[in-house]
């Protein structure tokens, strides 16, 4: 293979080398390697990955860019590798897990991205299910070791992950396998689903009895720890006080607008929760049945792509497919997006968690699906996936920065607001509630 520069070549090699240490990373890439295994979440496993990162960073800094494209590729890779090492060296990477992302939920969701066409595919699924116990144990061993140094996850998040694991244990993996193989052609996956459920039950009990009592009773982590994560999530060194004050001011402005809209939706309402409950019950927005929710979101996504293409963006034909699917029970508690595989054989996918319900309300889904699909994450990530001439392989697959990544999707919502997509009061309230959540996070 010919590369435009040594920096692009190193980027390409690093993605391969890192994927070799992460079977789940291979699945995300779609390269077909190690599909019968799961990641090693142990401290020793993380050390191997950190060693690779350190060696790669040293090689990267010794290279000279040949042009502006190269300079940007090098700068992005350097910042991400340095931020990743900061998390590893401080052991922060072992304590940021929650109801949105954690090794248990990532293990569960990776099965949804695996190929399911051949006998070999199902053999991989069976073997990977059998590996769940080992993956979970490698993780619990790591977090207990880190806890000895005083670093633990917030109790509220621990309880949430226990609940997710309990969902997996109570038939979650079996239901998944029935969905994959309704005819029962591959008995091994159904048998091994029981093993995975046993592992989930044992892990939930371990967290409840061993980890929860020593977990952090507070959500706050303090300025020093916050700064490490702020750098990782934004790629920048922030003035934390100024950022906090900006977030508070933004939340105040959003809140004021929400109350203006609340008066149009439910005059006399005493709380915004009361307004949200009213919208949840409004027949105009209620979608009954999981299949109908998915159909609504798929139709919505297809319509958004058709509307945006040619008028506001030139969307490549290769990325005009973006699927809407049901998220596994017990997975992330909010909608999310998975980019396409490197070769585009697996399309970009949006996921809707139903949280045990059989209906949803569209008033808050409209802005969310502009955020997740088009012109949000799908347009963003799928476009990046095909820009192989201008972006290094690391920029495409390894350089996700929330400040830019989520910033794009948040702007996508604001862009649609500018186009009048949220003129209806209920839909605007959904948009504003999502904006308020992001401002409150800051």
Regions found by a protein language model. Give the residues of each.
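N-terminal maturation segment of proteins
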Residues: 1-442
